[in-house]
Every structure is written in C-alpha cells, then in structure tokens.
A protein has these predicted regions:
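N-terminal module of bacterial RNA polymerase sigma factors
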Residues: 1-30, 34-38, 211-213
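C-terminal edge and immediately downstream basic/flexible tail or linker adjoining helix-turn-helix-like DNA-binding
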Residues: 2-4, 8, 162-165, 179-213
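Arg/Lys-rich amphipathic alpha helix in sigma70-family domain 2
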Residues: 65-72, 83-105, 117, 125
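Internal acidic/polar
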Residues: 11-14, 100-125, 129, 156, ...
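Helix-turn-helix DNA-binding module
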Residues: 134-145, 153-170, 181-184
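Short, charged helix-capping/linker segments at alpha-helix termini
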Residues: 4, 22-30, 40-58, 72
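Amphipathic, Lys/Arg- and hydrophobic-enriched alpha-helical face
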Residues: 31-50, 65-66, 136, 188
Length: 213
C-alpha cells in the first residue's frame, strides 16, 4: 500500500483555522494553543493571576461562540482576542483601580505586597513603584487600556486600534496622554515609548504619533 505524505508548508493562518472550525469545531483548539499563554499573561497583568485563570477561559469561550462572525480578512486573531479580553477586564475596572492604589500605598509605607497581590509579568515591576501605580490608577479606562495593551500584550498601535475598535489616531493620542501622565508622576523622567520587558520603556516599533481622528 502506498502511503501519501501529508503536505507540508507554513502553518495555516488564524483566519483559515477559524474558517475551518465553522464546519469542524475541534479545529478551534489550534487558536487556543497558539494564543492562550499570551492572553493569560495580559489578563494576569490587568486583574491578577486568580481572576486571569477564569477570564482567559472566558475569552476563548466567547471567541468560540462568536467564531462564525470573525472577519476572515484579518489573518491574525490576536487583536480580536485581546479586544475580547479587554472588554472582560472592564468588568473588573474598579477592582483594578483599587489594586493599583493599594500597591501605591503599600510601597509608600514600605510594606511589601505578597506575590498574590502583585500585578503579574512585565508590568509588575513598574506597578510596584508608588508614583507609577498611582498614575496608572488615575488614568481613565481608554487611556489605561492603550498603554497596557502595548506594554503587556506587545501590540503595536494598529493592533491596539483593531482590538479596541477605535481609530489609529485615537490610539496615538491616548498613548501620548498616558505617557505625559507617567512622565509627570516620575518627576519629569521621559517615558519615550511603551513599556518593554521588566518595566523598561522603549519606543513603539515603527510608529509615529498622529493627531486623533
């Protein structure tokens, strides 16, 4: 018997996998495997590890239920998934603000928070600084979502725009406002771009700020 080898080539795009999942729901597992880790890390940085476990599962439950409405013109599902995640975070907005303010108070009084109380992953080191924690807490919802999608999720400005369903120029203006607020909170230090790994600040790759539209 002659066995025909499976065709080899680059992995199917997210859009192709999602389209296949319309008729074969089990194919959606590939989207979960590709993106769950990043989505969970983003949520952990926004709402803490315990809540992130539940919310990350909910992101993919919602995505699966809505997969037949996915825009197949978008080959990568990352912005879509981060948009769902950010919408879920909004339900925890007050809790998030209390977390940042508590971190700021504890740091100001020299009290070290437990690991469970720390904001996870890349933003944790930055959030533990009282001035920066207070600045993040003071930002409005939209102004806080933008820099954290850049900081924690590693999205560029265009991907943030797709995630939040807002114009590219609005992303740039919100990011600019957030940087200005953080600059003031850091005593004039220049946060010239997004947060990088371990709370470092670096320019957004290939992006120039534009007026909001």
């Amino acid at each position: 018997m002659i066995v025909t080898a499976e065709p080899t080539g680059p992995p199917a795009t997210d859009a192709a996998v999602i389209e296949e999942s319309w008729a074969a729901p089990e194919r959606f597992e590939a989207i979960f495997r590709r993106h769950f880790g990043q989505i969970h890390r983003y949520l952990a940085a926004r709402v803490g590890g315990r809540t992130a476990d539940d919310l990350a599962a909910e992101v993919f439950t919602i995505a699966f239920a809505q997969r037949q409405r996915y825009d197949l013109a978008r080959e990568c599902a990352r912005p879509w998934l981060y948009g769902i995640a950010t919408n879920l975070v909004s339900a925890y907005r007050r809790r998030e603000q209390r977390r940042y303010r508590a971190l700021a108070r504890m740091a100001a009084h020299g009290v070290a928070p437990s690991d469970e109380d720390l904001v996870a992953d890349r933003v944790s080191a930055a959030a533990a600084r009282p001035a920066l924690a207070a600045a993040l807490a003071g930002l409005g919802r939209g102004d806080r979502d933008v820099p954290l999608l850049v900081a924690v999720a590693g999205l560029d400005n265009q991907e943030v725009a797709l995630s939040l369903g807002i114009p590219y120029g609005t992303v740039c203006s919100r990011l600019s406002r957030a940087r200005a607020r953080l600059r003031d909170s850091l005593g004039g230090a220049n946060p010239a771009g997004s947060y990088g790994p371990a709370g470092n600040i670096r320019p957004v790759r290939g992006q120039k700020e534009q007026p909001s539209g």
